[in-house]
Design a protein with these regions (language model features):
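Conserved AMP-binding A3 loop
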Residues: 67-72, 191, 198-222
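ANL superfamily adenylate-forming
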Residues: 63-64, 149-194
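Conserved AMP-binding/adenylation subdomain of ANL enzymes
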Residues: 221-238, 245-289, 303
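Gly/Ser/Thr-rich phosphate-binding loop
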Residues: 260, 287-292, 301-360, 372, ...
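Conserved ATP/PPi-binding loop(s) of AMP-dependent carboxylate-activating enzymes
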Residues: 381-412, 448-450, 544
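Conserved pre-ATP/AMP-binding loop-to-beta segment of ANL
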Residues: 53-55, 171, 181-202, 208-209, ...
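AMP-binding/adenylate-forming catalytic core of the ANL superfamily
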Residues: 127, 134, 144-147, 290, ...
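AMP-binding/adenylate-forming catalytic domain of the ANL superfamily
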Residues: 477, 510-532, 551-570
Length: 571
């Protein structure tokens, strides 16, 4: 018999599935399920998985090797893993650093930790030893689970931790393979309370000390019902989410959301993202739902999409705004619309374009079921343009518990009437939100407010541009002027002629106050989740302007007299 909590969880899920294309009714009727106790892995996953021979997990690598597990195999393996962890002394509330690539053991251990009541702290395999030491110390992590390729980085910094290696035996580490000898049945240490901790994320942002975001057994497992409504997944789907472990989006779309409806999680492991191979894999494996960050979509449209007869039904994107031109190119080739969604590590999906609704290219969408979202100005008043802010009364299930170890920051974020995302947007007459930028990305030039995203959207439509980031460059007369940092498409040379052509095209397209006055062809520094580190670009720009120097492939509008009546000094 299902638990009362599971019954309520499934009733809320089923309402969203029943109205998956009826936005107004879903918004009107959905309520977050009320429950005091709930363990998503025990109360939902195990009953769904028992005797279920459908693929729950399907991993393919670029060499063609495949491995898969049925839902029932995952249920049993995670039970063994939970018993194994308990045997090693892991208890409810203990924090586990899990530093694994996309391999089967990752999912077994994520389920096991939830069943046990331990707290998962997913980490990318790219972290340095200094990063790991910071996480272990500030996060009070007691258990380290790592890939063999990562073990050396824990030397001298994890001596007090339980250390488990997945993949091969390592001196001083317990081999995860030993879990195979433990019992197939698992009995929990009592009930799991909804407010018990479940996941601890270190934000990928651009500061040297990432914030620690704490989620509960309710906020992510239950909160992702809003994400389910946005993604539009259904039982039997094969869902491919282009994401790496350690990023919150991995938990969104490679754990909770697909398995909440019994969809297959599909993984394509490759050393470097290859658009042609990825597209071929989509076709060969019959993927029905694809969610990818903008960087991946921008790479995919460089291929001739019409050559790939995909069987996709749902296309989604999150992480950063997607330029309308990308959406148009995909629509022209496949007849499918990429539907954008918006959320944060601190939340589940709060805004989005769900299936069956009119999509306005480039829009973040509208509030998703369970969320009320408003735009607030600097005085905290409702505005047509302002900070994207979640109404906290009633509090959505998907909002984080706190910033762990930082009571003051938590109070500022969650102690008032709204949770502010630090993202700025505008809203149109039909309730669609439009991204403007991070609160620290938007700048003024000659007293005009500049949204980098608007300029980047124009740049990405130029035939020579693959990717772009617009930042402010210090200017004596205007305070700041827009500068474009550009990655060119393959085969395009980073010459003065290319710079002239792009600047001229932007001059013809943009308003005079938006004019891009500097362009540099360069790499774009990114976080492990693929977000551009604009703070690094800004810091370098400030140094150069103060020193009166320029980059090797940096061009100013003053270099091209035909583009301006008053050339600007080039250094």
């Amino acid at each position: 018999m299902p638990t009362e909590a599971a019954t309520r969880f499934h009733a809320a899920r089923d309402l969203l599935l029943a109205h998956r294309t009826d936005y107004d009714r879903a918004m009107a009727e959905f309520r977050w399920p009320e429950m005091a106790e709930f363990n998503w892995a025990l109360d939902h996953f195990d009953p769904m998985a028992q005797g279920n021979a459908q693929k729950g997990l399907w991993i393919v690598d670029e060499g063609g090797h495949e491995v898969s597990r049925t839902f029932d195999e995952l249920r049993l393996a995670s039970n063994r893993a939970a018993n194994f962890l308990r045997h090693l002394g892991v208890r409810r509330g203990d924090r586990l650093l899990v530093m694994l690539p996309n391999r089967v053991e990752l999912w077994e251990l994520m389920l096991a930790a939830i069943k046990l009541g331990a707290v998962l702290s997913p980490a990318t395999t790219l972290l340095s030893q200094a990063d790991l030491q910071d996480r272990i110390e500030r996060g009070n992590l007691r258990v380290v689970i790592a890939d063999p390729s990562c073990c050396a980085r824990f030397g001298g910094i994890a001596d007090g931790c339980v250390r488990i290696v997945c993949g091969s035996a390592e001196p001083g580490w317990t081999d995860y393979a030993d879990s195979a000898g433990h019992a197939d049945a698992f009995a929990p240490d009592g009930p799991t309370r909804c407010d018990d901790p479940c996941m601890l994320y270190f934000t990928s942002g651009t500061t040297s000390k990432p914030k620690m975001v704490l989620h509960s057994q309710r906020s992510y497992p239950v909160g992702h019902l809003s994400t389910l409504y946005w993604l539009g997944l259904q039982e039997g789907d094969v869902h491919f989410n282009v994401s790496s472990p350690g990023w919150a989006k991995h938990a969104w779309s490679c754990l909770f959301t697909p398995w909440t409806v019994g969809a297959t999680i599909f993984i394509y492991n490759q050393g470097r993202f290859d658009s042609a191979k990825t597209l071929g894999t989509l076709v060969r494996c019959g993927v029905s739902s694809l969610c990818a960050p903008p960087t991946a979509w921008r790479s995919l449209i460089l291929e001739d999409l019409t050559r790939y007869p995909v069987r996709l039904r749902e296309l989604t994107s999150a992480g950063e705004p997607l330029n309308p031109e990308v959406i148009e190119r995909v629509m022209a080739a496949w007849g499918l619309t990429i539907r954008e969604g918006f959320g944060q590590t601190e939340s589940t999906a709060m805004l989005g374009n769900p299936p069956g609704q009119p999509v306005r290219y480039g829009s973040m969408g509208r509030p998703l079921p369970g969320y009320r979202v408003e735009l607030l100005d600097v005085d905290g008043k409702s505005a047509r343009e302002g900070e994207v802010s979640v109404v906290l009364s009633p509090r959505p299930a998907g909002v984080m518990v706190a910033y762990a170890g930082d009571e003051e920051r938590s109070r500022r974020a969650l102690g008032g009437s709204h949770y502010g995302t630090a993202d700025v947007a505008s809203i149109d007459d039909d309730g669609y939100f439009w991204y403007v930028g991070r609160t620290d990305d938007v700048f003024k030039s000659s007293d005009y407010r500049i949204s980098p995203f608007e300029l980047e959207s124009a740049l990405i439509e130029h035939e020579a541009v693959a990717e772009a980031a617009v930042i402010e460059s210090p200017d004596a007369r205007r305070m700041f002027v827009p500068k474009a940092c550009v990655i060119l498409k393959p085969g395009v040379q980073p010459t003065a002629d290319t710079a002239r052509a792009i600047l001229a095209a932007m001059r013809a397209r943009l308003a005079p106050y938006q004019k891009i006055r500097i362009i540099e062809f360069c790499d774009l520094p990114k976080t492990v989740s693929g977000k551009i580190r604009r703070t690094e670009l800004r810091a370098l720009e400030a140094q150069r302007r103060a020193a009166g120097t320029r980059g090797e492939l940096e061009f100013f509008e003053g270099d091209f007299p035909e583009l301006t009546d008053k050339p600007r000094a080039g250094g």
